[in-house]
Structures are given as structure tokens and as C-alpha cells.
């Protein structure tokens, strides 16, 4: 948003702001995006499942901010929809800044006439600890939404938000979740991802954990302990999915023990799409 504002402030017309990462735009010619990968046309997608799959695969292969190319989908006879490469991962400070904006922590009052939003009871007292997921589960679109590179909030930011939760009049002492796309991913899969992006054509955990995978739950354990120790907090649950193959790859069983002892609210939630048995 800041980049768009800067471009407008510099005097560029909207029609020429076609280069900002994480944005999609409409153009009449590919002259200004000569290196774009051309996807099947919109009409082809609506008529042929194989073309749809081919388009999806090209998009899937271009979700990494370090290696992705611009994508162009022909639409009609004179238009192209251009998708720019994803934005680079946010730093921890940027994550903190975004998540600590003065949100209202509830739905818009206009929904009252419809009876409210039932899901608010689950998410109102939940903490989002990070973005991104390198799990690669089948049928999961989170790679498209947030990318494979983990971006993490600081302990201090999460504790500040938890303290604000405890001041809500309907807070009963229970933090429902401290999670993300995958709860127990609190850092990138490896240090390479921060400078060179993710590996093309390879998964971090499938069919077996990569030899370069960093497996460590200590940061998450320490965060959960700090949250459990807060005044007015009775229980801290984890209701985001747990990748249990990542848990089993950890040489220490400390996280598994504390997970079972303190953080399961009746039934452990896992990310099952990476197994077939």
C-alpha cells in the first residue's frame, strides 16, 4: 500500500503502476511485461479442466518472492491480467507493526441485524503468531495466500496482545489458539530461504525431512510458557494444526510433552493432508 501511495505521489498515473509486488493489474499489451509467463486464457480455463490444472501448476511454481515471474492470463481478445511476483517476507518488526494496529477485535456492527458472526467466539481470543507455511499439505492453498517462508511475530508483541485480551469484559481466562497456518512452525525451514527463497520442485518435509531442515521448538515452548504465566490467563490452547512429522523430527520431546500437558483442549488438531494411511 505504501509503495502504491509513493508511486501515485510521484505523479505516475494508475495505468502505469503495473510493477508493484503482490499486486494484480489489467493491461492491453504485454510490451511492458515481456518476460511474463503466459497462462491459458480465461475461456480455456472455464472449458477445459486440464488447462485449469496447467494454469494452477504454473501459478504454484511462481509463489516464491525470490524466483517467481510475472504471470499473464489473456482475458477476452484485448486484455491481459498481470500478476506480479509476491512481496518479500516481512521482518519481525514489520509483523509486529501490522498485528499491533488498533484493531477493534470484533465484527462490524452491521452484522448485528444478521445475528452476529458466530465464529468470533473462537477467534476473538486467539493469537496469530506467524505467517507462511512450508508444510506442503495436499489441497491446501495457504502457500498461495502467505508463501512458504515463515514470518514471525516477536514474543513481546504477542504478550502485549494477550494482555489486551485479558482486559476484555468477556475474557474468561482462555486463550483459544497461539498459532498460524501450522502452529509449530516458528522460523523458516532453513536459513537459505531468507536470501535465496525456497527450493524449486522440492518440499521441506516430503517425502522425508530435508537434511537442511532446522527442527527446533524451543522458541515456541518459551513463548507458550510466557503466555501461560500471564495474570488472568487460566489456559493457553493450540487449535491450529500441528505437523506431527515435524514434532517427531525434533530430537527433544519437550514440546510434545508440554503440548499434551497444557495446550490440548480436548482433541489435538493436526494437519493430516501429508499422510495417506
Functional labels for PLM-detected ranges:
Residues 164-277:
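Conserved SAM/AdoMet-binding glycine-rich loop
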Residues 1-123:
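Flexible, acidic/Gly-rich N-terminal and inter-domain linker regions that tether
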Residues 125-138, 148-157, 161, 165, ...:
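Cysteine-centered iron-sulfur cluster-binding motifs in ferredoxin-type domains/subunits
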Residues 142-145, 180:
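Short Cys/His-rich local motifs and their 1-3 flanking residues in nucleic-acid-associated proteins
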Residues 81-88, 123-130, 144, 148-155, ...:
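Hydrophobic alpha-helical scaffolding
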Amino acid at each position: 500500500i505504501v509503495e502504491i501511495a509513493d508511486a501515485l505521489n510521484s505523479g505516475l498515473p494508475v495505468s502505469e503502476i503495473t510493477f508493484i509486488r503482490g499486486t494484480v493489474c489489467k493491461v492491453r499489451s504485454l510490451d511492458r511485461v515481456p518476460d511474463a509467463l503466459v497462462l491459458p486464457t480465461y475461456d480455456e480455463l472455464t472449458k477445459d479442466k486440464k488447462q485449469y490444472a496447467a494454469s494452477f501448476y504454473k501459478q504454484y511454481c511462481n509463489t516464491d518472492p525470490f524466483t517467481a515471474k510475472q504471470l499473464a492470463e489473456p482475458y477476452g481478445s484485448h486484455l491481459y491480467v498481470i500478476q506480479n511476483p509476491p512481496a518479500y517476507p516481512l521482518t519481525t518488526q514489520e509483523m509486529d507493526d501490522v498485528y499491533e494496529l488498533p484493531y477493534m477485535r470484533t465484527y462490524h456492527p452491521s452484522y448485528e441485524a444478521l445475528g452476529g458472526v458466530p465464529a468470533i467466539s473462537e477467534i476473538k481470543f486467539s493469537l496469530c503468531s506467524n505467517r507462511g507455511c512450508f508444510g506442503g499439505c495436499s489441497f491446501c492453498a495457504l502457500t498461495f495466500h502467505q508463501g512458504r517462508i515463515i514470518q514471525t511475530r516477536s514474543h513481546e508483541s504477542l504478550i502485549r496482545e494477550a494482555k489486551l485480551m485479558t482486559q476484555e469484559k468477556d475474557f474468561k481466562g482462555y486463550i483459544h489458539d497461539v498459532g498460524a497456518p501450522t502452529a509449530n512452525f516458528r522460523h523458516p525451514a532453513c536459513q537459505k530461504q531468507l536470501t535465496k527463497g525456497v527450493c524449486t520442485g522440492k518440499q521441506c518435509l516430503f517425502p522425508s525431512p530435508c537434511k537442511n531442515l532446522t527442527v527446533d521448538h524451543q522458541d515456541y515452548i518459551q513463548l507458550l510458557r510466557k503466555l501461560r504465566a500471564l495474570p488472568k490467563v487460566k489456559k493457553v490452547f493450540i487449535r491450529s494444526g500441528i505437523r506431527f512429522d515435524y514434532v517427531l523430527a525434533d530430537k527433544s520431546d519437550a514440546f510434545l510433552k508440554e503440548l499434551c500437558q497444557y495446550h490440548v483442549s480436548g482433541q489435538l488438531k493436526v494437519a493430516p493432508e501429508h499422510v495417506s494411511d
